[in-house]
UniProtKB/Swiss-Prot annotation:
Statement: the UniProt record of this protein carries the keyword Methyltransferase: no
Family: Belongs to the alanine racemase family.
Biological-process GO terms, alphabetical: D-alanine biosynthetic process; peptidoglycan biosynthetic process
Catalytic residues (positions): K40 (proton acceptor), Y263 (proton acceptor)
Signal peptide positions (record): none
The encoding gene: alr
Name under which the protein is recorded: Alanine racemase
Modified residue annotations for N6-(pyridoxal phosphate)lysine: K40
Molecular function via GO: alanine racemase activity; pyridoxal phosphate binding
Chemical reaction(s) catalysed: L-alanine = D-alanine
Isomerase among keywords: yes
Length: 366
């Protein structure tokens, strides 16, 4: 998708805020551990390459979701460790070795496929994934973990780490978290051969369960300044939201009582009012169900009226503002603030999704 560079809609990313957030979280951790910056999904919509370069001196490596995301970083000159959290195709092992990428091994079945590949396994770096209760990928028993590690050792693979992922670390009820933690700790303690690196701490675990950290952490949503729990749990240290979303009025008109706006004529004016049009829509990740949400114009809240279209949306203005007036959809304007969590709450989703949905049509400015 081509960025719309000639359209007045932009996502501004404060890289210094991301750096400051990492510093605060690292100081919150009770011991020195290895730090991975999670930059999957285009760094949660913030721009993977720009973010990775900005935090290079603060982290030991990066986590991505897939091989393509890892290759993007390598092609941009990022040479620190990159851990691919998802499972890659066994047929792509040579690419992983060529670019010195660390892969995740999650099952014996996959390993049997990998053994058929003609590659130099002594150059392959892996972390073993344990499914302690998340239910997606990973070995699910001590016997399976020991068998997998034994085969990897026989193959001459560089076994660097073992890890798991918590399903409820951002919730006030700790029952499931404690169950997963106990399972993982017992499994690691009983391994016939324990890898040097052990990690289970995502953003939420690093914030609210820092006493459970092993010797590495994976920092994702928190480095971008967002609370993993939404507003359910209080942050133990203040963070700054790094991304703001702005557009500008491209059309302003006055409508009369009875006039309708948008697809389905879902909004009908009750009286004479001013309406402004913004060049942003659901193709940009500003979803169709945002009718009724408020944006900021000259520091005042204005309602989105009518259904959000593919490329445009309309707002009810307090007065006839001139074309080119800035409109803030996420961020601060004057004394008022709209957060990604506010958007998420309105949509009935999570702040992660709000940022990840922002499409490549929206240019990022740093």
């Amino acid at each position: 998708m081509i960025s719309s560079l000639h359209r007045p809609t932009v996502a501004r990313v404060d890289l210094e805020a991301i750096q400051a957030n990492i510093d605060k979280i690292q100081r919150h951790i009770p011991k020195k551990v290895k730090t991975y910056a999670v930059v999957k999904a285009n760094a949660y919509g913030h721009g993977a390459v720009a973010v990775s370069k900005a935090v290079e001196d603060q982290v030991d490596g990066y986590c991505v979701s897939n091989l393509d995301e890892a290759l993007e970083l390598r092609q941009a000159g990022i040479d620190k460790e990159i851990l691919i959290l998802g499972v890659i195709l066994a047929s792509e092992l040579q690419l992983a070795i060529k670019h010195q990428l660390t892969i995740t091994v999650a099952s014996l079945e996959w390993l049997e496929l990998a053994k058929k590949e003609s590659v130099d396994f002594s150059q392959l770096h892996v972390h073993v994934k344990v499914d302690s209760g998340m239910g997606r990928i990973g070995v699910r028993s001590l016997a399976e973990a020991n068998q997998l590690i034994s085969i990897l050792s026989d193959m001459g693979v560089q076994l660097d780490g073992i890890f798991t992922h918590f399903a409820t670390a951002d919730e006030s009820d700790h029952a499931m978290f404690d169950k997963q933690l106990t399972f993982f700790k017992q499994l690691v303690e009983q391994l016939d051969k324990r890898p040097a690196l052990v990690h289970a701490s995502n953003s939420a675990t690093s914030l609210w369960h820092s006493e459970t950290i092993f010797n590495a952490i994976r920092l994702g949503i928190v480095i971008y300044g967002l609370n993993p729990s939404g507003n359910s749990l209080s942050l133990p240290c203040p963070l700054k939201e790094a991304l703001s979303l702005e557009s500008r009025l491209v059309h302003v008109k006055q409508i009369q009582a009875g006039d309708s706006v948008g697809y389905g004529a879902s909004y009908v004016a009750a009286e004479s009012e001013y309406v402004g049009t913004l060049p942003i829509g659901y193709a940009d990740g500003w979803t169709r169900n945002m009718q009724g949400f408020k944006v900021l114009v000259e520091g005042e809240f204005c309602d989105i009226i009518g259904r959000v279209s593919m490329d445009q949306l309309t707002i009810r203005l307090l007065q006839a503002y001139p074309i080119g007036t800035k409109v803030t959809l996420i961020g601060q304007q004057g004394k008022q603030v709209i957060t990604a969590t506010d958007v998420a709450d309105y949509r009935g989703t999570i702040n992660y999704e709000v940022l990840c949905l922002l499409s490549d049509r929206i240019p990022r400015e740093y």
